[in-house]
Amino acid sequence: MTRASVLTGLGSCLPSRCVTNAELERTMDTSDEWIRARTGIAQRYVAEEGTLTSDLAVGAAERALKSARLTPDEIDAVIVATTTPDRPCPATAPTVAARLGTGPVPAFDVSAVCSGFLYGLATGSGLIASGAAERVLVIGAETFSRILNPQDRSTSVIFGDGAGAVVLRAGEPGETGALGPLRLGSDGTGVDLITVPAGGPPRPGAAAPDDLADRYFTMEGKRVFWLAVQRMGECAESVLDRAGWRVADVDWLVSHQANHRITARLADEIGIPRERSVSNIAEVGNTAAASIPLALDHAHARGTLRPGDRVLLTAFGGGLTWGAAALTWPAVDPV
């Protein structure tokens, strides 16, 4: 019999420093009105000097384990989805696993930018389906502020730092909390649309002058907008079809929190009322791979998500990459 993956715990972690739009007004050519109108963001959290991606990942993981009523030594694998690891090599996940105290279990990173959490979810679910693991910790964690050009208002006003985590356990298909159909995709011809151009062998970061903008994250916003809506919409329709759900059956849409215009347009394209689209972008900004688990945890804490609710997850990120998944919301302990 096919083993399902059931969401049994979740948690999140944000840095202590909150940066409002008013603060950004004092450091760059922008305004609160401009930022809100184009992104829907009012504030974002930024990691203090010395705070690493692994620090946020551990904080979110500890809360997820508490929510699942598990101890670290009961976890069989740790997956960290991130674009901003502690260092280029090795992966951040082994550091997270060691700090949690999981023991010598498999621990590795997944890099798919803003789609990373869904890629991690698919990988964790695959470990459970194959029998290689009974319980998997999947974390999305970012310190995106470290790769942003502080003078580029097209990116610096959008992104924030943070982490979200879920615990998956082996279960039965169809039980409350079970992860349903999941679809992923990519298109490498769009690699330059969302990227940090310098840092790899073709353009080593160490050889770049201090003022080289290519050291920072760049994005072609207008092209990304339409591609994100198109790809997430197509993926969502495929997942709904495979799950046997009608659009009217979906209680909540939880999409990657890119900006409020993308999430609103996506809801319209799928046919889900905008008021059924979960959003926390005003409070935390775009947190890349952390955005979906952060949105889930915050919606759960507010009482928005209730056991048995049918939830549709969608994401789009650099690569280009995208994904969607169906999930029946579980009875999860709040933390």
UniProtKB/Swiss-Prot annotation:
It is found in: Cytoplasm. The active site is at residues 114, 256, 286. Its EC number is 2.3.1.180. Transmembrane segments: none annotated. It holds the Pfam family ACP_syn_III. Pathway: Lipid metabolism; fatty acid biosynthesis. One of its GO terms (biological process) is fatty acid biosynthetic process. GO terms for cellular component: cytoplasm. The keyword Magnesium does not apply. Residues 257-261 are annotated as: ACP-binding. Keywords: Acyltransferase, Cytoplasm, Fatty acid biosynthesis, Fatty acid metabolism, Lipid biosynthesis, Lipid metabolism, Multifunctional enzyme, Transferase. GO terms for molecular function: 3-oxoacyl-[acyl-carrier-protein] synthase activity; beta-ketoacyl-acyl-carrier-protein synthase III activity. The keyword GTP-binding does not apply. Its main location: cytoplasm. It catalyses: malonyl-[ACP] + acetyl-CoA + H(+) = 3-oxobutanoyl-[ACP] + CO2 + CoA. It is an enzyme of class 2 (transferase). Homodimer. Catalyzes the condensation reaction of fatty acid synthesis by the addition to an acyl acceptor of two carbons from malonyl-ACP. Catalyzes the first condensation reaction which initiates fatty acid synthesis and may therefore play a role in governing the total rate of fatty acid production. Possesses both acetoacetyl-ACP synthase and acetyl transacylase activities. Its substrate specificity determines the biosynthesis of branched-chain and/or straight-chain of fatty acids. Belongs to the thiolase-like superfamily. FabH family. NCBIfam families: fabH, PRK09352.1. The last Arg residue of the ACP-binding site is essential for the weak association between ACP/AcpP and FabH. This is Beta-ketoacyl-[acyl-carrier-protein] synthase III 3.
